[in-house]
Amino acid sequence: MAVIVSDLTYVRVGTKWHYVCLFVDLFNREIIGCSAGANKTAELVYQALVSIRGNLNDIQMFHTDRGKEFDNKLISKALETFGIQRSLSMKGCPYDNAVAEAMFKVFKTEFANGAHFFTLEKLALELDDYVHWFNNIRIHGTLGYLTPVEFKQQTL
């Protein structure tokens, strides 16, 4: 869990847009933290950060785009508390956060597109199920056709 990346995307809940924040371990592409909420805020990012199971002191770097949800006092204080260095993409360069962008392409294709979430609670429940499936069952070509959890177990 040395380097983690994150981003946000939107998902339809009822008739409104809600947001999902994912934290991905760059080493094995495992989704290690997530949150869902009605607003695209620093609190949503913070909720995803505190959902990470494991020692946050093991994280050396946190990379994101330059969105205000990531670059603010709340997140800065949390990162400082655990000695995590922040890395921000260059302005106007989404390729700097390519792993997170690719993750959300997969997420939208496999999870969000065509899904009907009538409540935020239903979204959160199905998001937890998806994360479990993604980490423990779904194989990844970049990981030698192992799941993220299998890859971590075999290499550490």
Residue ranges and their predicted role:
Residues M1-L156:
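Charged DNA-binding/catalytic regions of mobile-element recombinases
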